[in-house]
Amino acid sequence: DISQLNELYPAVRDQNPYGTCWAFASLMALETTLKPETNIDFSEDHMSINNNFSMTQNDGGEYTMAIAYLASWTGPVLEEDDPYGDGYSPEGLEAVVHLQEAQVLESKNYDNIKKSVFLYGGVQSSLYMEMPDSRSTSIYYDENKYSYCYIGPEKPNHDIVIIGWDDTYPASNFTFEPEGDGAFICANSWGEEFGDRGVFYVSYYDSNIGVHNVIYTGIEGTDNYDNIYQTDLCGWVGQIGYDRDYAYFANVYTANDDESLEAVAFYSVAPDSSYEIYIVEDFKDEASFSTRRLLTKGTFSNAGYYTVKIPEKVNLEQGGRYAIVVYI
């Protein structure tokens, strides 16, 4: 029931006047993962301005930008430290939590989406919204029943958060009746004047709902690690194919201090993947890769961004060069 869900989830917010639905959806999904133990309001302003892609708040965005911002520990920061709507983000703000895992769910796998809503509270997903804001109308939206269903070729242009579902929601409640009953209950970012205090129904048969789905499943305190080594703040922006279903990739780093390697974080771009993580100590050149040593291995059920803890810490000397190699 929408009225009950409104009591359990973060208050619906208003992205007006910017094209920042992606930031609102990702941070609401992040906040729902932390509830009910932690009630926190993250800053959409900070994410949308400090997005590492040199894009403005009116350029739009999507979930890979949100994951990149969070995975790099650029944020999130608190709303009170960077309030929304002024087009300005103060310098020097630091993340108040660290994202260590975000899973990308398989397209249109509704059982997996429902399970994730049950476990984590909210799933970030996307729609094609013919209407640009709450002041507009659309032939695909019923203002009285708060129901939306678009069936057609248009690609997603708006992010929302799936916070519930109703398998018996009547198909007759939609302006264009789909082939069956059922709807996801979604939180929008157009303020409380849209839908039922910001929440609405989206048919299971909508062309885009459930195609792109993200859950933020690993959130830790900022004291979890002393340092993060990274070379690319844009994260996963795409992939190219190979003539095989496996690949190696590696990065070379120089230790800033005497410290220990405790975890390795990377993207897996396909579901049901297995991985092996290696280290090359005292790295000199390409020939050094032959000395790689296995640290750990495992599997991922879903695509996404993962942090894998190393069973035995590896001591690193200040100024020493080392390579991390992943086989996946």
Give the location of each predicted region.
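Catalytic-core signature of thiol
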Residues: 1-262, 270-298
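Conserved "cap/hinge" positions at secondary-structure junctions
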Residues: 127, 268, 326-328
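Short strand-edge motifs at loop-to-beta-strand transitions and within beta-strands
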Residues: 251, 304-306
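Short, well-structured beta-strand segments enriched in hydrophobic/aromatic residues
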Residues: 264, 306-328
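Short proline/glycine- and polar residue-rich coil/turn motifs
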Residues: 297-304, 316
